[in-house]
Amino acid sequence: MKYSLGPVLWYWPKETLEEFYQQAATSSADVIYLGEAVCSKRRATKVGDWLEMAKSLAGSGKQIVLSTLALVQASSELGELKRYVENGEFLIEASDLGVVNMCAERKLPFVAGHALNCYNAVTLKILLKQGMMRWCMPVELSRDWLVNLLNQCDELGIRNQFEVEVLSYGHLPLAYSARCFTARSEDRPKDECETCCIKYPNGRNVLSQENQQVFVLNGIQTMSGYVYNLGNELASMQGLVDVVRLSPQGTDTFAMLDAFRANENGAAPLPLTANSDCNGYWRRLAGLELQA
């Protein structure tokens, strides 16, 4: 299996991102995704900056993929997305059907991101015709669902025409909204948010009345409160999953990437902690569950 670093979903300063990707260039990742995937108002790093970072990574020997917005809300955003799609060098991760259409019109291959509502083989076949070469499974699906879906793909004769990627580490994006919950948590309207999410480099925690961390707010994203960690599920991915994705949580992610690789065959199990780690979705359980 290959290992990928997903796009940074948090709002980090440009300098922090540049330092992160400098380390990513020498990491054990096979694939690096980068780009603004959450909110177009996060302008500390502009489209041109992302493209420059991608070019600086091009000589690392890794596949570089440009990630795009999961929720397109304005015509101005389409102009920026067009710059990504027409970059002329790097593969695109499409997280919105508008970007899928842009790629299809230009006959460009793309990665279908986990934000696309793709739950069956017929949908995958449609995306294949439009140029999909890799599919990142929606985060709430289980191993059992994946097995059944790939069996459907076998019946349609398309199983070997695309790669399967699974988001296997990080806070999971559970929902997207036109509203900004981070701004709302500071009693700000979205139009006057002052990109306050930059104050929360790992999101803003939401606790239940029982003091359980149930969610993390990240701008328009509502994310899982616990960190999804499938580091001990890698053996069960053999023959099903081509690319294991880790969502950056900070520079510690590189050590976690190495730990995943070391445990690919179950030789070095990762220590997981209840009330901070979870693997429920993969096991077909409630998402916040952790099953050994």
From Swiss-Prot:
Keywords on record: 4Fe-4S, Iron, Iron-sulfur, Metal-binding, Ubiquinone biosynthesis
Keyword Protein transport among record annotations: no
UniProt xrefs under Pfam families: Peptidase_U32
Residues annotated to bind [4Fe-4S] cluster: C39, C180, C193, C197
GO biological process, any: ubiquinone biosynthetic process
Names of the cofactor(s): [4Fe-4S] cluster
Phenotype when changing C197A: Does not bind iron-sulfur cluster
Molecular functions (GO terms): 4 iron, 4 sulfur cluster binding; metal ion binding
Disruption phenotype: Deletion mutant is unable to synthesize ubiquinone under strict anaerobic conditions. Mutant shows normal levels of ubiquinone after aerobic growth.
Pathway(s) where this gene product acts: Cofactor biosynthesis; ubiquinone biosynthesis
Keyword Iron-sulfur: yes
Function: Required for O(2)-independent ubiquinone (coenzyme Q) biosynthesis. Together with UbiU, is essential for the C6-hydroxylation reaction in the oxygen-independent ubiquinone biosynthesis pathway.
Family of this protein: Belongs to the peptidase U32 family. UbiV subfamily.
Subunit relationships: Forms a heterodimer with UbiU.
Protein name per the record: Ubiquinone biosynthesis protein UbiV
